[in-house]
Amino acid sequence: EVGVKERVSSLSTRSIKRESKLQALNYVVSMCDLTTLEGEDTEGKIHQMTAKAIRPDPTDDDVPSAAAVCVYPSLVSTAKEIIGTSNVKVASVSSYFPSGQVPIESKLLDTQYAIDEGADEIDIVINRKAFFEGDYRKVFDEIVALKEACGDKHLKTILEVGELRTYDNIK
């Protein structure tokens, strides 16, 4: 135990070189998604956010682009148009984000619409009602169906862990 405390103490006094800090920060930026999911989203807001994703720091060409922008399905084509040939992806929420409280058929239509609009990635929410009722098979089957609908598009599942209430629910 004493050895561990000494090692931790020595680590906390070490400084990280500026170059290493910048490298780490650039790596983090390159993995981030810029997201806007507000009722007041407009094409202008999407343009502003997308420009920031492409060039997070207009004064420094060494700062990489963000990984993606995430928008509602109805704004995917706008984001896609602005992205142009940059390497930034366009992600879209689907499955009636944020609640997910609709039949799977509606979720599939929502997902297909986002893909048809040009989404590179789909972000879904799980059926929390089914989860809280213990119907884990339904949750699983819906995720499988949505992944099949995505084809080769990347699928991410958003877990509202704050709503899962207990550590036992976070499995």
Model segments located where?
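Alpha/beta enzyme core
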Residues: 19-27, 40-64, 74-171
